[in-house]
């Protein structure tokens, strides 16, 4: 555990360790040999100084090196965000993934159980009939045939269990709250990535650049939502071909009316699954609007739209002509082993 202790010594002095020590420490954390006290000390020490983009990228590399990988078509995207915004909203990024798949994108949707809401992506997809523990070959088939597959984080990231007890004991956010979206098992290079605090917009974009991402929209609603919101504007850090630019986007640019936060409140996994079914059957309202907005951004990343407003229109059409619902139904069938 040499690198962890080198890092702890540096943290105690109020200084950053060198990059090699940080990278080595992350490897040691996920090896299963580090004591919980050392893991906790490393995570708190890094958080106290502030996680830099290079630190975040190092953690993601360590996680990626141990994950169970799947193959995805070239150009596949992910809509997984950090979660943890405390808003308790509908499962927006999951719904956006389904809609984007219906519109022609290939979406390797990485996700987990609920972080701060009542319903995480895996919770609602299970309610919709998706089998979470299907083998990698079934996920790959789903990506090929349904254009959407669910990559259940615990099934692909077994090494994370080694830091679980220390994280639970700390009860504070650490770098691991940021690493999941950076560690897609399909190795996607295009991402719509919502963060729970706008201070992470540029650092996450820089970490993605370090990790070889081609095109990403790192987003945070000005209401604190880790999505493109429809209650107000959203802030975006866009990474494209190595360059990062910051700008804001307002839902009215896509022809969408502003709503109240209360209009976006989700419920239990069963509640949210029922809402997704209704949306895919054509129900209008605030949930549809925020879902097509985020799906529209995903379609920009997939190269199927040039602007978010254009993508939003394409997303709406995929609902209205039944393609989005068909994508979900095919994903459910494949995950359950049906021909």
From Swiss-Prot:
An example GO CC term for this entry is: cytosol
Binding positions for Mg(2+) 1 per the UniProt entry: 93, 227
The cofactor note reads: Binds 2 magnesium ions per monomer.
- An example of a Pfam family matching this protein is Glycos_transf_3
Q: Which reaction does it catalyse?
A: N-(5-phospho-beta-D-ribosyl)anthranilate + diphosphate = 5-phospho-alpha-D-ribose 1-diphosphate + anthranilate
Among the GO biological process terms of this entry, one is: L-tryptophan biosynthetic process
Cofactor(s) of this protein: Mg(2+)
Positions with a binding annotation for anthranilate 2: 167
According to UniProt, this protein's pathway is: Amino-acid biosynthesis; L-tryptophan biosynthesis; L-tryptophan from chorismate: step 2/5
**Residues holding anthranilate 1:** 81, 112
Q: Quote the InterPro entries the UniProt record gives.
A: Anthranilate_Pribosyl_Tfrase, Glycosyl_Trfase_fam3, Glycosyl_Trfase_fam3_N_dom, Glycosyl_Trfase_fam3_N_dom_sf, Nuc_phospho_transferase
Q: Which UniProt keywords apply?
A: Amino-acid biosynthesis, Aromatic amino acid biosynthesis, Glycosyltransferase, Magnesium, Metal-binding, Transferase, Tryptophan biosynthesis
Oligomer and partners: Homodimer.
HAMAP family, alphabetized? TrpD (MF_00211)
- Family of this protein: Belongs to the anthranilate phosphoribosyltransferase family.
Identification of the protein by name:
Anthranilate phosphoribosyltransferase
Origin organism is: Maricaulis maris (strain MCS10)
High-level lineage: Bacteria, Pseudomonadati, Pseudomonadota, Alphaproteobacteria, Maricaulales
